[in-house]
Design a protein with these regions (language model features):
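Non-catalytic alpha-helical scaffolds and adjoining flexible linkers that form interface surfaces
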Residues: 1-23, 27-146
């Protein structure tokens, strides 16, 4: 096994691979957009099951392979459960994640984009802020970042 690295990031996308594994696209502050495989993440009782949910934000423990990374553990700080409970918020969050995936680059620092995504998700959960306003601010700021 190669050296383990720890990085702060957010799961943008999760897709099943085989019977028990998941392929994740993470946006990390120091490595940009990366692809990681969570082996056994679909098994009941797996420690990686919750960490491989879309919108999960935290510190991920990974090992680098030739083409991708393998996920070995995570300390999730925020699951953004409120986004999944409101269909409109979930749609906006998915839209923001798609933007981040499109504009994110592998191997390039993405701290500003990660911060923007995190703050936008938090803003979606505040009923006082209209979601349309959050969307417009997100779109403007992501264009400035890139």
């Amino acid at each position: 096994m190669r050296d383990l690295i720890q990085t702060t990031g957010m799961v943008l996308y999760a897709a099943p691979v085989g019977e028990f594994d998941k392929r994740l696209i993470l946006l990390t502050g120091d490595r940009g957009k990366i692809t990681a495989f969570a082996r056994g993440a679909k098994r009941t009782g797996s420690l990686l099951r919750a960490a491989s949910r879309p919108f999960a934000f935290g510190t991920f423990t990974l090992s680098e392979t030739r083409d991708a990374y393998n996920l070995y553990g995570a300390e999730i700080e925020n699951y953004f459960e409120g986004l999944e409970q409101d269909v409109e918020c979930a749609c906006y969050a998915s839209y923001f994640a798609e933007f981040a995936e499109y504009f994110g680059r592998e191997g390039l620092e993405a701290k500003e984009m990660l911060r923007l995504l995190y703050q936008s998700f938090r803003a979606l959960l505040k009923p006082a802020l209209p979601n349309k306003l959050v969307q417009r601010i997100f779109e403007l700021k992501i264009m400035v970042i890139n």
